[in-house]
């Protein structure tokens, strides 16, 4: 059995973090770190990481014995406490070494110099680091054990109140998260006979065995239940991003009543940042006459567009559009599609990362484009909600292309929206024609952290997709698979549909406007077309709901042949006779069709599409 100790490398990282931190950070008289990593070349069992202090170091061997043949157990034990930046570096380094299936965290006795508020803040940050560094690991959080008065041990020491306070903070924070609580405070701490009479903190041999059994039992139960992490791959501190950021007006860039500003953005690698926005509120909107609002997210190569904001303001909505590449449209004329398109100036103090640079995926999640952009979108949303006259209960989000990708992630993370409307944008990036042949650890890591297929199931609001059959960027097959993951959805699949990143209002599908008017202004719902039912003799029945809208036409869109790139596939359209009785259409599958779907178009050009179906042929 091969075993190695990573203490040297982690001690170096810890020492570096120690040297870079402020002297005001509370420190122990003796600082130490101890790492144990067995079975590094074995992958036949789940891998468990114990993170903690000297108590964890005490019971580590017993946990290994109890889980022998069931899991490999590794340990990061350290004197650093929550609140100490050095601990952040130690945990990140450990998570970079291995992929862990379960992480058991037990750290609360150290750091007496930190207030409860500081502990709570550090808890959020540590949780984010663990979630980002091990997105699919199952997380167990142990309550901190009490401290007893030595040598009699029957009396609890005053320091126990700190354990109680911190345990309450943990329980409150973890209440809505997919985290198992291992109550060591009760199962171990309630037994004075488990403590050594030297200091009233550490355990004797009986206590060590009991703690090891409790920890191993909790881990074993999680393994036996086949528990999987059902949350998001990456953690954002929404409490922080739900606060309205500071704003610096940029009146020289105001356009036709649409205002320009720099907003304070997410901290990036320890630095403060800013990002550019255009925003507007219709005239007459105030606290007595609030208006609904939209968050607008551009695609790759784009920036914040005043014209997009104005389109919505003219329809009676407040709106905000942010730059998600650290840029702003200095020097660009009113038409953003002139030859300078994509030639945007950089925002001083902005985050200048590329949405398509997958090589960054090996960095910590909070140093990657998707994390920073989602955080800034939340801040832009919070700023919009703070504006006088904006109805915070009536806000939707839409985005085109990469903005559609961001729309899906935003809707999963930010629970304040009422609907989401991605124009293109979907999951299963590894199945895109565009990324065929993409390999490597960075690519695999990007898929783990950011592929929308991990997020769509966590979206609790309706999703309205608008897309095309032959898009070069977002392939039709992955789009269909993504739609199937949604809890509640609308879809409009045109053949073909021009790809746009949102700068041109013509790129905003009619369905997005109609859905916003439905949810926020009492307009009719969108039509829906349900999955086709195969009948005998090659016939198909498709049911649909018009939502009170007049049907203009019903079409079957089909493709002949299979294989090859989705963008190269040929699609044909046959218009079907309108049925005498509305709500169901029956037709024969076109000869030679290998795949088809049905579109119902209602007045105003509102399209509703069925899921696609592969035929037996």
Map each language-model feature to its residues.
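Active-site segments of SGNH/GDSL-like serine hydrolases
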Residues: 104-110, 129-165
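Surface beta-strand/loop "capping" patches
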Residues: 507, 517-558, 572-584
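Conserved SGNH/GDSL esterase-like catalytic core that processes O-acyl groups on lipids
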Residues: 22-125, 135, 164
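Short beta-strand element of the alpha/beta-hydrolase
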Residues: 276, 288-299, 310
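Short beta-strand/loop motif that positions the catalytic acidic residue
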Residues: 459, 465-467
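N-terminal cap/lid segment of alpha/beta-hydrolase-fold proteins
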Residues: 239-289
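Cap/lid segment of the alpha/beta-hydrolase catalytic domain
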Residues: 310-374, 426-434
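Catalytic His-Asp segment of secreted/periplasmic serine-dependent ester chemistry enzymes
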Residues: 145-223
């Amino acid at each position: 059995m091969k075993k190695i100790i990573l203490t040297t490398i982690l001690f170096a990282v810890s020492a570096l973090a120690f040297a870079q931190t402020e002297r005001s950070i509370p420190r122990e008289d003796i600082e130490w770190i101890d790492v144990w990593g067995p079975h590094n070349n074995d992958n036949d069992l789940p891998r468990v990481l114990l993170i903690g202090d000297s108590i964890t170091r005490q019971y580590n061997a017993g946990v290994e014995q109890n889980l022998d043949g069931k899991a490999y157990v590794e340990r990061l034990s350290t004197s650093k406490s929550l609140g100490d930046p050095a601990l952040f570096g130690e945990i990140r380094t450990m998570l970079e070494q291995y992929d862990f299936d379960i992480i058991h965290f037990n750290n609360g006795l150290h750091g007496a110099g930190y207030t409860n508020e500081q502990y709570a803040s550090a808890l959020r940050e540590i949780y984010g680091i663990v979630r980002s560094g091990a997105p699919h690991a199952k997380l167990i959080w142990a309550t901190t054990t009490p401290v007893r008065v030595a040598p009699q041990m029957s009396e609890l020491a005053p320091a126990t109140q700190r354990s109680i306070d911190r345990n309450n903070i943990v329980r409150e924070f973890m209440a809505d998260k997919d985290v198992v609580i291992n109550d060591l405070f009760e199962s171990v701490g309630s037994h004075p006979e488990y403590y050594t009479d030297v200091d009233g903190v550490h355990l004797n041999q009986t206590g060590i065995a009991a703690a090891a059994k409790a920890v191993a039992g909790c881990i074993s139960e999680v393994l036996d239940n086949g528990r999987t992490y059902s949350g998001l791959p990456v953690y954002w501190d929404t409490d922080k991003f739900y606060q309205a950021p500071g704003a610096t007006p940029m009146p020289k860039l105001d356009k036709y009543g649409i205002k320009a500003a720099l907003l304070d953005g997410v901290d990036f690698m320890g630095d403060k940042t800013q990002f550019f926005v255009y925003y507007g509120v219709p005239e007459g909107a105030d606290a007595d006459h609030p208006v609904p609002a939209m968050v607008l997210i551009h695609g790759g190569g784009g920036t914040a567009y005043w014209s997009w904001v104005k389109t919505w303001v003219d329809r009676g909505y407040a709106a905000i559009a942010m730059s998600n590449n650290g840029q702003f449209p200095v020097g660009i004329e009113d038409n953003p599609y002139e030859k300078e398109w994509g030639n945007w100036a950089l925002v001083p103090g902005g985050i200048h990362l590329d949405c398509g640079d997958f090589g960054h995926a090996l960095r910590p999640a909070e140093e990657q484009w998707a994390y920073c952009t989602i955080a800034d979108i939340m801040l832009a949303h919070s700023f919009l909600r703070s504006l006088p006259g904006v109805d915070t209960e009536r806000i939707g989000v839409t985005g085109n292309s990469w903005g559609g990708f961001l729309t899906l992630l935003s809707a999963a993370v930010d629970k304040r929206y009422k609907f989401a409307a991605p124009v293109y944008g979907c999951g299963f990036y590894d199945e895109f024609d565009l990324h065929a042949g993409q390999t490597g650890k960075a690519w695999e890591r990007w898929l783990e952290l950011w592929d929308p297929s991990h997020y769509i199931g966590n979206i609790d609001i309706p999703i309205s997709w608008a897309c095309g059959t032959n898009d070069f960027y977002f392939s039709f097959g992955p789009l269909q698979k993504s739609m199937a993951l949604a809890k509640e959805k609308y879809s409009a699949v045109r053949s073909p549909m021009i790809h746009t990143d949102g700068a041109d209002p013509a790129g905003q599908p009619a369905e997005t406007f109609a859905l916003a008017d439905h949810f926020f202004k009492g307009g009719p719902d969108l039509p829906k077309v349900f999955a086709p039912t195969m009948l005998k003799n090659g016939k198909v029945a498709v049911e649909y709901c018009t939502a009170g809208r007049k049907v203009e036409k019903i079409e079957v869109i089909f493709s002949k042949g299979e294989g090859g790139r989705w963008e190269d596939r040929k699609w044909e359209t046959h218009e079907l006779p309108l049925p005498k009785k509305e709500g169901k259409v029956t037709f024969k599958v076109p000869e030679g069709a290998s795949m088809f779907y049905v579109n119902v178009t209602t007045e105003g050009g509102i399209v509703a599409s069925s899921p696609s179906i592969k035929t037996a042929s």
